[in-house]
Amino acid sequence: MKILHTTPAQDGFYMPAEFAPHEGCLMIWPERADSWQYGAYAARKAFLRVIETISESESMTVLCSEGQYDNARAQLPDRVRLVVMETDDAWARDVGPTFVINGRGERRGIDWGFNAWGGDVDGLYPSWEKDNRVARKFCDLVSNDVYDKRDFICEGGSIHSDGEGTALVTEACLLSAGRNPDLTKTQIEQVLCDYMGVSKVIWLPRGIYNDETNEHVDNVCAFTAPGEVVLAWTDDETDPQYALSKASLDALEAATDAKGRRIKVHKLPLPKPVTITAEECDGLDLCDGEPTRTPGERLAASYVNFYIANEAVVMPAFGDPMDEKAQAILQELFPTRKVVAIAARDILIGGGNIHCVTQQIPKI
């Protein structure tokens, strides 16, 4: 593995869309006691369903701590590769490398800086050194050269690419005080163009209400095809999410992509508000002496937090009447893939969902 100090755009590399073919997927075995209630037992069951579904059509690598290796190996399908690598938590989307390709059979990774979604300003845990090493270590594991961009804080969940020159981000996240406060919006956009290999960045104002990542784009909006997106939506104007989704809709309707196309927006309904119970809170350890959740707190539940595998779309379900409607919409948008709904409340309690715990490895 070489550590590169050029940029992907300079070298003819770009971030492909998630709906492009994959070689595989990266996930991390959940363990952290202040993220995953009651010893992560229920979370692991949900992770296993995600792993089993994705690994039917692409290779799967799972990282785990040395202490969890035997337990994880006993539960994971034999086809899944299990690797000991220390992490601070299980958010593969945000700590794993962002992979870029050149269309000529080469793939490289990007090692962004990671500071637990806000560092000393509003980060979610006090120490993130292990997480900040994952991207580079994983690139070494798969023998891919890596671009060093640790001086720029960026998580995989905060960026989407259509593979044809357009990126999708939120202002709430990318311009947050805890990430790159010394850079202007224009400078941040240039970094995205240089490293994602895009020529157009569509900025959505906001994400999902109460999303503690400062409103990652992957929870509110995602490309389903070039020039097409799904947008998390509610018709309830009294819900605080309505104004956030409406602002994003306005931005999308005013935008064109890198190829000059208007964006076709498919509204994906939200479930009714999901809140955490006192019993669930009691199952979480304190973080730095403070509780990580309070009973009744609204969680950032959204069907947009799905993963596009080679032969499946793996979406979260919440035991809500909207589960079936969201699944039907996604099935219409992805006719060549099977849309699989997985009960994901136990992932949501940790702070994210299915897209947040997965990271695709594009095929070359």
Predicted regions and their residues:
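Histidine/cysteine-enriched polar flanking segments
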Residues: M1-I364
